[in-house]
């Protein structure tokens, strides 16, 4: 028995909208549901409604159905020609590629020059090395054309032969059964792996692969200011091309070791500076380490813990050359764990006084400095 038109099943016209299809499906599914309907053929009608909705609610399936009818309703062409699909999921993509792809379109020459592959190499730098940059000589494993056979893969004194199975084209014709009849598809020749050539006597060095694995030394310039996770592109130092094609690029990925004192935030450097209570309360001038050398920093009296000071131009250079970052110094008060009796008495005196005069500050400063 031939299938009814899906639009007819749902009681719709071909121009029905998505909302109209949904409404029709809900109404008919409820009407013919086996648990509700008393009609004799309710199960068959319910299945028919489900099948129609499955196709018409999917834009791709609906387009195929509108063009090809029931033959194109499902991707696998299930049910066409008395049952079964063609090759377990042979769909429209396969058919159209057969018509317009491998056999009918422009075919690439299997022996044409092809570019090689990109390579990646990881390096680890110290914090200061990333700030100031450096030159590295790295040794990377690469596949280069075989020197013995000059990249041909054939034993010296011999040459490749034209594949007899594909007549040097690199492709063979394969017949396939489709819903539209028998078609001829073109695919890569299995005897020559799509190259169109056979190596009778292989090179003893590369065993016919035309390439050999070796380690190559490459000079890499690490720019100043590079940050963790960034990469450097070294043009033309990737894997060699095929059939005389150009080499691709080498990408050097940089990892930066953590520093015991400094942290990096973009072009800026952050550090924490421990100070005593007396230094914070009374003020002081301290030496602060930077990657460019020590600099003096004036701490105003009454500075609170967590206060941030900026040292302009003492950060990392921008890796693209756009100026220089700054260094930010965050001061933290260090509470002593061991106090002398004199220091304890002074702190109790300080805590008990409502007005803090200069004489008490002087005593505190001398006590904490051990004077």
Swiss-Prot record:
Q: Which GO terms describe its molecular function?
A: ATP binding; heat shock protein binding; unfolded protein binding; zinc ion binding
Q: Which compartments is it annotated to reside in?
A: Cytoplasm
Q: GO:BP terms for this protein?
A: chaperone cofactor-dependent protein refolding; DNA replication; protein refolding; response to heat
Q: Name the coenzymes or cofactors required.
A: Zn(2+)
Zinc-finger (CR-type) residue ranges come to 133-215
Q: Where does Zn(2+) 1 bind?
A: 146, 149, 203, 206
- Binding-site positions, Zn(2+) 2: 163, 166, 189, 192
Q: What's the domain of life for this entry?
A: Bacteria
Pfam families associated with the record: DnaJ, DnaJ_C, DnaJ_CXXCXGXG
User: Which GO cellular component term is one of those annotated?
Assistant: cytoplasm
Provide the alphabetized UniProt keywords: Chaperone, Cytoplasm, DNA replication, Metal-binding, Repeat, Stress response, Zinc, Zinc-finger
Cofactor binding comment, as recorded:
Binds 2 Zn(2+) ions per monomer.
Under SUPFAM superfamilies, the record lists: Chaperone J-domain, DnaJ/Hsp40 cysteine-rich domain, HSP40/DnaJ peptide-binding domain
Record carries keyword DNA repair: no
Instruction: Outline the CXXCXGXG motif repeats, range by range.
Output: 146-153, 163-170, 189-196, 203-210
Q: Where would I find the J domain in this sequence?
A: 5-69
What is the documented function of this protein?
Participates actively in the response to hyperosmotic and heat shock by preventing the aggregation of stress-denatured proteins and by disaggregating proteins, also in an autonomous, DnaK-independent fashion. Unfolded proteins bind initially to DnaJ; upon interaction with the DnaJ-bound protein, DnaK hydrolyzes its bound ATP, resulting in the formation of a stable complex. GrpE releases ADP from DnaK; ATP binding to DnaK triggers the release of the substrate protein, thus completing the reaction cycle.
What the record says about family reads: Belongs to the DnaJ family.
| Subunit-level organization | Homodimer.
Concerning HAMAP family, the annotation shows: DnaJ
UniProt comment concerning the protein's domains: The J domain is necessary and sufficient to stimulate DnaK ATPase activity. Zinc center 1 plays an important role in the autonomous, DnaK-independent chaperone activity of DnaJ. Zinc center 2 is essential for interaction with DnaK and for DnaJ activity.
| Record's protein name | Chaperone protein DnaJ
Q: Which organism is it from?
A: Bacillus cereus (strain ATCC 14579 / DSM 31 / CCUG 7414 / JCM 2152 / NBRC 15305 / NCIMB 9373 / NCTC 2599 / NRRL B-3711)
- Lineage, uppermost ranks: Bacteria, Bacillati, Bacillota, Bacilli, Bacillales
